[in-house]
From Swiss-Prot:
Keywords: Ribonucleoprotein, Ribosomal protein, RNA-binding, rRNA-binding. SUPFAM superfamilies: Ribosomal protein L20. This is Large ribosomal subunit protein bL20. It comes from Anaplasma marginale (strain Florida). Belongs to the bacterial ribosomal protein bL20 family. It holds the Pfam family Ribosomal_L20. One of its GO terms (molecular function) is structural constituent of ribosome.
Length: 128
């Protein structure tokens, strides 16, 4: 059986790992073993945080919706329940975007919910 020299494949593998570790600090950017460990840890963090990002954004959207809704005298939970009863199907991402950038549209949603459910909110009191 012929002898296999593994230098070429090992060198290619090492180069790939070191290239992926570009931008790291210290030995992690150019020492293969340190780079491999740092890279594995980075991939673990990336996997974990792709899931955490979904949670974090949902929490952010809820905080923004709640803050905007309370300016009109209605709580987040009341707003969401009222939207379900009214048949308004806006997801939290779009609702938070409206609350920040399109206050007039958000006010219309709040007034529709308040009118249907009978919540006393600032929108209804301005009309009177």
């Amino acid at each position: 059986m012929a002898r296999v020299k593994r230098g070429v494949t090992a060198r290619a593998r090492h180069k790939k790992v070191v290239a992926l570790a570009k931008g790291y600090r210290g030995r992690s950017k150019n020492c293969y073993r340190a780079a491999l460990q740092r890279l594995e840890k980075a991939l673990v963090y990336a996997y974990r945080d792709r899931r955490n990002r979904k949670r974090d954004f949902r929490r952010l959207w809820i905080v923004r919706i709640n803050a905007a809704a309370r300016q009109w005298g209605i709580k987040y939970s009341q707003l969401m329940k009222g939207m379900a009863l009214c048949g308004i199907e806006l997801n939290r991402k779009m609702l938070a975007e409206m609350a920040v950038n399109d206050k007039a549209a958000f006010e219309k949603v709040v007034s529709a919910v308040a009118g249907t459910c009978g919540y006393a909110c600032a929108v209804n009191q301005q009309d009177k």
